[in-house]
């Protein structure tokens, strides 16, 4: 069981994965009594895409092994169908690049992140779009990200994302700076969340947001 807001977010994330254009088909397995029912999830995905989607409930199918057998068979059928697809050219304006952290150390903000930011700028300049994830890792550098906002409204939204996340953690008695940087980040030479954030935001390049 879960609170409604978390359940809704879980569904949105799963639907987002399923609708990703890099995914040919979807096989969903559920227990049968969870707060995100596999049938409802399947129907929502089908309403948003025409890709093949099937779902199985362990309790309905008669156990785990029977469910796995059917799911594997369905996945193999989809893989065979996907192998027959032909590549098609598309306009670069249809390209959306997701930018994700790869484990930060003292060199990330000087080398790898700026390189990714340069790629982002090149693609955006050609008409593509990029998304920089992990807004928690903007904290301490969000004012620099906000400076790139194309409008005052977007500027305020960027600041609000970070403020809301900190408020959410504080309401639960947590401090985002207590767990950031991670032990691995510190072993790599980072000392504070602000330092990590200044490197993180370099991934986003310099183009207007």
Task: Please report, for each region that a protein language model flagged, where it lies by residue.
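Metallocofactor- and cofactor-centric catalytic cores in central/energy metabolism, strongly enriched
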Residues: 1-209
